[in-house]
Amino acid sequence: MAENNFPPLPRFIPLKPCFYQDFNEIPDQHRTMCKRLYYLWILNSATLAVNLIGCLAWMCGGGGATNFGMAILWLILFTPCSYVCWFRPIYKAFKSDSSFNFMAFFFVFMAQVVISIIQTVGIPGWGVCGWLATITFFSTNIGSAVVMLIPTIMFTAVAVLSFIALTKVHNFYRGSGGSMSKAQEEWTSGAWKNPHVQQAAQQAAMGAAQGAMQGQQYSAAPTYNYDDPM
């Protein structure tokens, strides 16, 4: 079994990586989408970090410490939770063509989209520099509001990209014949947690794709029949 390599922690930290991540084990036809979702997770995490700075400016401008404290919780909790709860399921889904993991991704990522929209709105007291909080604070402190505007724009980008990603993955899943009943069958049989079954499904999918490509390659080649003269 491969050694865990994510997150890549410095050697002086007395902790070891918790997950194994290698995009080369994702089938070619899914690798680009999987990487884009990973970059979306990075953008979401970076947005939460920038939001912490925005809430610090908010507090320094007279906005109170509640938002800054909530921003710390957003960053500490949602950065690892979003990776574990929606990126890992879609990573496994693309890797082994698992309907159960696709359903887990859809369930959590829909909540992620809703949260991103709430963050974009920016309700005061929630620890996020959204549009409502930023625009109203311009009348109090323009300098702080300008700093708050940066995470506001980033939250908007995350919300839009998350909705687009959810739509694309859903269209792909339904187009490939996936359904809730298939996910229930995997849950009942326990195939979703069996690495041997997952590996076999992955190999079968890759073999089918290679066979289709070879069939297209040789379908145009002429065939000759020879009669035995003996």
Curated annotation (Swiss-Prot):
Keywords: Cell membrane, Cytoplasmic vesicle, Endosome, Exocytosis, Golgi apparatus, Membrane, Protein transport, Synapse, Transmembrane, Transmembrane helix, Transport. GO terms for cellular component: Golgi membrane; plasma membrane; recycling endosome membrane; synaptic vesicle membrane; trans-Golgi network membrane. It holds the Pfam family SCAMP. It comes from the Eukaryota. The keyword Isomerase does not apply. It is found in: Cell membrane; Golgi apparatus membrane; Golgi apparatus, trans-Golgi network membrane; Recycling endosome membrane. This is Secretory carrier-associated membrane protein 5. It comes from Danio rerio. Residues 58-64, 123-145 are extracellular. The gene is scamp5.
